[in-house]
């Protein structure tokens, strides 16, 4: 599995011939200086955790350009279908979606989900974390935007993820110390990748506090620069 951080909560996952984009907020991200076309080249699937603009991001345009299938909760899929995304594969919390080379499972997250158009709020279902279980290789858990919650223990028991993607930026998600507590208390990750930090001034700007809080835990923390990648 090759995992590329594209900034904020956006990732590119390459496994067994599939190219998965998670929450591809790219052109609107002031810290992303790459090419959307290059970042999304060969995309087969777009997996979305929830309906906020900084997570849906470029998903509709990428889906139209590449034909990638959008996998998300029902409301997000229907909303994007109305925006011209034809290849959708909806699910909901607790469900799993077989995508061939991998399975996507939608887990609970403590957050909100929606957007605003013409001054009106649009409800876009419950927020999710996503577990990507490949036919071969490590299981990946992207927590989405969330606070810590005790049922993370059930996610660990059910899916046994080896790689964790963890929001740490505070303000709109849990902060570094709470995120580290979640990792320590509920999971047995081989490696974790922090996200949802440094994008805007309201967020924590560095993963340093998260890394320090996991000191001595035995969990490897991979915190690449935007565009950097890991092989698992």
Curated annotation (Swiss-Prot):
Keywords: Hydrolase
Database matches in CDD domains: metallo-hydrolase-like_MBL-fold (cd06262)
Record has tRNA-binding as a keyword: no
Domain of life of the organism encoding this protein: Bacteria
InterPro entries: Metallo-B-lactamas, RibonucZ/Hydroxyglut_hydro, UPF0173, UPF0173_UPF0282_UlaG_hydrolase
Pfam families, per the entry: Lactamase_B_3
UniProt GO MF annotations: hydrolase activity
Keyword Transmembrane carried by entry: no
HAMAP family xrefs: UPF0173 (MF_00457)
Family indicated by similarity: Belongs to the UPF0173 family.
Entry protein name: UPF0173 metal-dependent hydrolase Msil_0741
Species assigned in the record: Methylocella silvestris (strain DSM 15510 / CIP 108128 / LMG 27833 / NCIMB 13906 / BL2)
